[in-house]
């Protein structure tokens, strides 16, 4: 995947993006852009609208206000260019497929669901597995892998798709230290190749490691900007609804 040439449209553009269910806003007024090679952390408490916003970017839920554009188009028109990595524990671990077969699923948005994967597709899938350190587990049944390994397989599936935009939902939840390091390295490679990354996460330390911008949400946008100037105790307090302080290791603690 070649890097995006300078001067093009942002990979992701949100303009007052709003989603409501039964007239009740779930997330509203989100503004921001994500450029090629950039990574943005979505941070907020449970129920803040992070997953809903990701679903809206995927074109799975309609906006009730504002706009979302992916590569200058509506999300539905750009689906082949967008990959999504859910939490590993949202998938059925008993589904009888191998790690390689899961990764091959990432090729279907490019080749279509009717065509069978060819040699080039299998090579892309094998390369993606190698990038997350699981080349030797290609034939292992997905359900026999550890939680961290399953999360790496799901990222490999996204890598095989060669996306321009990668969306992740809590990718580091419950993963071991090795998997965490391999996930961070793989995300860095994707960004270097020109992909934009948006991830929902509760881990502020990992947000600092993986992202250069942050979007703070609690049903509406609290802040959007460089992580060093936006992830402040004041804005975090506004996001989480209580007095907080940020320790040097990126951990939020309540003020006495």
Language model feature labels by segment:
Residues 141-145, 149:
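Conserved ABC ATPase signature
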Residues 104, 119-137:
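Conserved ABC ATPase "signature" region
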Residues 162:
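Conserved catalytic motifs of ABC-family nucleotide-binding domains
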Residues 229-256:
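ABC ATPase nucleotide-binding domains
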Residues 63-78:
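Conserved ABC transporter NBD signature motif
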Residues 166-170:
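Catalytic Walker B motif of ABC-type/P-loop ATPase nucleotide-binding domains
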Residues 43-45:
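The feature captures the beta-strand-to-loop junction immediately N-terminal to the Walker
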């Amino acid at each position: 995947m070649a890097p995006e040439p300078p001067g093009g449209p942002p990979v992701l553009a949100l303009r007052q993006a709003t989603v409501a269910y039964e007239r009740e806003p779930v997330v509203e007024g989100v503004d921001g852009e994500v450029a090629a090679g950039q990574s943005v952390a979505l941070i907020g408490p449970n129920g803040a609208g992070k997953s809903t916003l990701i679903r809206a970017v995927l074109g799975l839920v309609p906006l009730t206000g504002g706009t979302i554009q992916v590569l200058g188009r509506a999300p539905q028109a750009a689906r082949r260019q967008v990959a999504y990595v859910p939490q590993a524990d949202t998938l059925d671990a008993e589904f009888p497929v191998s790690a390689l077969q899961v990764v091959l699923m990432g090729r279907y948005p490019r080749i279509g669901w009717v065509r069978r994967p060819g040699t080039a597709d299998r090579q892309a899938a094998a390369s993606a597995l190698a990038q997350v350190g699981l080349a030797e587990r290609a034939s292992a049944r997905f359900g026999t892998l550890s939680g961290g390994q399953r999360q790496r397989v799901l990222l490999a599936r996204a890598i095989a798709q060669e996306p321009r935009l990668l969306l992740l939902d809590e990718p580091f939840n419950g993963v071991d230290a090795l998997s965490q390091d391999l996930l961070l390295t793989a995300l860095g490679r994707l960004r270097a190749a020109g992909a934009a990354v948006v991830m929902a996460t509760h881990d502020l330390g990992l947000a600092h490691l993986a992202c250069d911008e942050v979007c703070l949400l609690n049903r509406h946008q609290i802040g959007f900007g460089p992580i060093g100037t936006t992830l402040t105790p004041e804005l975090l307090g506004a996001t989480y609804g209580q007095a907080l302080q940020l320790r040097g290791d990126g951990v939020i603690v309540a003020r006495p």
